[in-house]
Regions:
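Conserved, structured core segments of small domains
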Residues: 1-116
Length: 116
C-alpha cells in the first residue's frame, strides 16, 4: 500500500543541522530498503499560488495568503505492507525529531492513497 506522510510543525522554525542529518540518514535507509519513494520540504506559502473555483469561475492568486493555522512543512511517500507498518515508521520519524531537536512540536499525519 502507498502512504503519504504530511508533516505539520506546531511552530514554523528552521530545522537544526543535527535534525537534518538524522532525517537524511533515516531517509537513505528507507530508500535503500525500497520503502520511501519520494520526500521533500515545502517552501513557504508566501512563495506559492492558489488556483480556485468560486461560483463557477477560475482564479489564480499569488501568495502571500492569509496565514493558516497549520502550514505543511514537508511530505514523504512510502510503499509499505499496511497501516500498522506506516504508523510504526511515522513514530520512528517523529522520534528522530524528538531526539535531535528538543522542543520541536508537530504532527505527522499518515494517509493511505486511494486505489492500488
Amino acid at each position: 500500500m502507498r502512504f503519504m506522510y504530511i508533516v505539520t510543525p506546531a511552530h514554523p522554525v528552521p530545522a537544526t543541522t543535527e535534525l537534518m542529518e538524522a532525517v537524511h540518514k533515516l531517509a537513505d535507509r528507507e530508500i535503500k530498503a525500497g520503502h520511501m519513494l519520494d520526500s521533500g520540504a515545502l517552501m513557504p506559502r508566501t512563495l506559492g499560488a492558489q488556483v480556485r473555483i468560486t461560483d463557477g469561475q477560475l482564479s489564480v492568486i499569488d501568495g502571500p495568503f492569509v496565514e493558516a493555522k497549520e502550514v505543511i512543512g514537508g511530505y514523504a511517500i512510502f510503499e509499505l505492507r499496511d497501516k500498522e507498518e506506516a504508523v510504526a515508521k511515522a513514530v520512528e520519524f517523529m522520534q528522530v525529531h524528538k531526539d535531535h531537536m528538543p522542543g520541536w512540536e508537530g504532527t505527522c499525519e499518515v494517509r493511505a492513497f486511494a486505489g492500488p
